[in-house]
Amino acid sequence: MSNTAYIDTCYGPVADDVIQRAANIRLLICDVDGVMSDGLIYMGNQGEELKAFNVRDGYGIRCLITSDIDVAIITGRRAKLLEDRANTLGITHLYQGQSDKLVAYHELLATLQCQPEQVAYIGDDLIDWPVMAQVGLSVAVADAHPLLLPKAHYVTRIKGGRGAVREVCDLILLAQDKLEGATGLSI
């Protein structure tokens, strides 16, 4: 039997170790496809790429930013619509077209003067693991690649693109006693 202690949250029980890790977070890094979106790529008649983003995720991101917790995006793909979404949310650290996400990660650490234990990363696939292995709180979305799930410190109860980012934002805010007073913007 495990000696792990759990804290009750609105998302269900969360291991005390995860709450302790979340209490130290100053930066949340998000992947996009499969995390901020459902992983599907919609193509318009003119070849334009379309994605759906969850408003709850956006609100959670705004709550983090207004609580002085930085948010960054590191993604392997490039899309103009992602620049627009990042601007809408107030995310100023956007790294697109990153086949090696560690390069952007190390740049963020230097720019924001963060230690690895102050960083949370939420991903869904094997390309995310090199960064996840180095951060203080590694998170996999509920429908992440099966090999990623057992490696993460925390697995969301909600699937990518369906509010998983909001779940992580709430967890960080809860751990830092900022959830009750957190407010974002209507987005």
From Swiss-Prot:
So what EC number does this one have? 3.1.3.45
Q: Which InterPro entries match?
A: CMP-NeuNAc_synthase (IPR050793), HAD-like_sf (IPR036412), HAD_sf (IPR023214), KdsC_fam (IPR010023)
Give the CDD domains listed for this entry: HAD_KDO-like
Recall the GO molecular function terms of this protein's record: 3-deoxy-manno-octulosonate-8-phosphatase activity; metal ion binding
Look up the record and name the cofactor or cofactors this protein needs. Mg(2+)
Keywords in alphabetical order, please.
Hydrolase, Lipopolysaccharide biosynthesis, Magnesium, Metal-binding
Please verify whether the record's keywords include Hydrolase. yes
Question: GO annotations under biological process?
Answer: lipopolysaccharide biosynthetic process
EC class, as a word, reads hydrolase
Residues annotated for substrate binding in this entry: D33, N54, V55, R56, D57, G58, R62, R77, R85, K101
* Keyword Magnesium recorded: yes
Q: Which reaction does it catalyse?
A: 3-deoxy-alpha-D-manno-2-octulosonate-8-phosphate + H2O = 3-deoxy-alpha-D-manno-oct-2-ulosonate + phosphate
Q: Which residues bind Mg(2+)?
A: D31, D33, D124
Q: In which pathway does it act?
A: Carbohydrate biosynthesis; 3-deoxy-D-manno-octulosonate biosynthesis; 3-deoxy-D-manno-octulosonate from D-ribulose 5-phosphate: step 3/3; Bacterial outer membrane biogenesis; lipopolysaccharide biosynthesis
A Pfam family annotated for this UniProt entry: Hydrolase_3
Task performed by this protein? Catalyzes the hydrolysis of 3-deoxy-D-manno-octulosonate 8-phosphate (KDO 8-P) to 3-deoxy-D-manno-octulosonate (KDO) and inorganic phosphate.
Query: What is said about its interaction partners and assembly?
Result: Homotetramer.
Similarity comment: family membership: Belongs to the KdsC family.
Name of the protein described by the UniProt record: 3-deoxy-D-manno-octulosonate 8-phosphate phosphatase KdsC
Give the species this sequence originates from.
Answer: Yersinia pestis
